[in-house]
Amino acid sequence: MKKKMFILISFIFCLSLMLPISIQAAQKKESVIYSDFLQENPSYTWFRTLDINKDGVKELIVSKKELEFSANVYYVYTIKKNEIVYVGKVSHSRAFKDGKSKVIFYNSKLKAIREALTSPRGFGLNLYKISGSTLKETVRMNRSLGRFPVYSIGKNNKDKYYTTASDIKKFDKLVDRYFYKGCKKYVLYKNTSSNRAKYLK
C-alpha cells in the first residue's frame, strides 16, 4: 500500500514538473507563429497579444495605419491546431480614439473586448467574446439623442429600454460597469522587429 502511494505521489510530482514546461513550449510556438505572421503582413502596423477567453492561448490583436479622421479597426486572430485563424474585428470610431495611440479595451469579467461606434444621432458600445472561432456579441448599449431619445442595453439579443429619469440613472450605472470601469485599456505596439522580440514571449 505504501509502495503504491509512493508511486502515485512520484507520478503527481513529475506531472507537476512537466506541466509548466509544456505550457512554456506552447507559448514559445505561439510567439513564433505570431511573429512570422506579423513579418509576412507588414500592413498590420500595430499589434499586441491578449488571452481574451482565458483558455491559455493568447489572441493576436492587430491594426493598420488609419487616416486621422477614420475609425480604428482592430483585427483579432487566434491559434487552432498550430494554425493562425481569423476571429473577427472591432472598431473604435473617431470620437473614441485615444490620441494617436492604438488601444483595445478588455472586460476580464466577461472575457470580452469593446467596440465603440458613433452616428450623427448617438453612439453604441458593444462587448464581444470569442465563441468557437468567431467574435460573438455578449452585451450592447445604444444611446441615441434627438426628439425621441433612446437608451437601451441588450443581452442575448434582447434589449431593455430605459425611459424614466430614474431608469436612465440605472442605465448610466450599467454602462459604466460594463463598458468603462469594467474595462481595462491595453496599448498596442508598433510592428517592429525589436517589439516583436520584446512582446511576443
What do these predicted regions represent?
Residues A26-S43, E83-G99, T192, K198-K201:
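Blade-edge motifs of beta-propeller repeat domains
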Residues R94-I104, G146-Y151:
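Repeated scaffold domains used in trafficking and secretory/extracellular systems
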